[in-house]
Amino acid sequence: MMEASASWDICDVGAPGILNGMKNYDIQMLGLCDNEYNTALFVRPDSPQAADPTNPEVWKGIECILPTGTTLQYMFLSYLQSLGLSADDVTITNMDVTPALTAFNAGEGDALCVWNAVAYNAEDSGLVRITDVSELGINNVCGLAATKDAMENKSDLIDLAWMVYYLTWDWCQQSEDNMAQAVELYVESC
C-alpha cells in the first residue's frame, strides 16, 4: 500500500504499514483509528484444523493465504507460537484479503487470514473461525496516515476526511443495526 502512496492522500492502515510508511515513504501518522478485533484465521469445515484446532501436528506443512507484512501475519504467527510452531513449520502465500478469500473458496490453501468485512464474508461462505486477535489477546492497532504532500497542500480535505472517519465509526458503534448497515455498505463497495 505504501508503495502506491503517490495515488492516495489519506489511508487507514495497520501498524506495520504505518511504520513502513513513516520510515520509507515520508508518510505522517494522524492518529489511531481502531483496534481490528475482526482479524481472524479461518479454515474449511471439513479440514483437520477445524476438527482439532489446538493440535500442532495438523498445522505443520499447511499453506496459509494472507497479505504478508501485515497485522494478519502477526496474528497468524501469534497463533502458531501459541501451538509451539513458527513460520518455518508452514507455507505462507502472500495475497490481498479479497482475492485471498476468492482463491480459498476455489480450493487454494489450507488456511486463510482476513480482516474486517472480509471476515464476515468468510463466515457467510461457511468457513470456520479458528481464532482472532481478541481471542489471542493481542493488540492489532491501526492508524490513519496521510502523505506529506496532502498534509501540506490539502490540509482542509485531510481534516474533513479525518472527521468523517471518526464520526462514521461513532455512528457504527451506536447500534448493531448501524454496524450491520456499515458492513453491508463496505462489502458492496470493496
Q: Model-flagged regions — what are they?
A:
Residues 1-86, 91-94, 110-116, 129-133, ...:
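Short, glycine-/small- and polar/acidic-enriched structural segments
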Residues 12, 66-71, 98, 113, ...:
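Soluble non-cytosolic domains of exported or imported proteins
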Residues 17, 118, 150, 178:
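Flexible, active-site-proximal loop/turn residues at the rims of small-molecule/cofactor binding pockets
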Residues 19, 57, 74-78, 102, ...:
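Solvent-exposed, polar/charged alpha-helical surfaces in well-ordered, non-transmembrane soluble domains
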Residues 33-43, 123-150, 154, 158, ...:
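Periplasmic-binding protein-like
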Residues 81, 123, 187-188:
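Short polybasic/polar patches that bind polyanions
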Residues 152-190:
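Secondary-structure end/capping motifs
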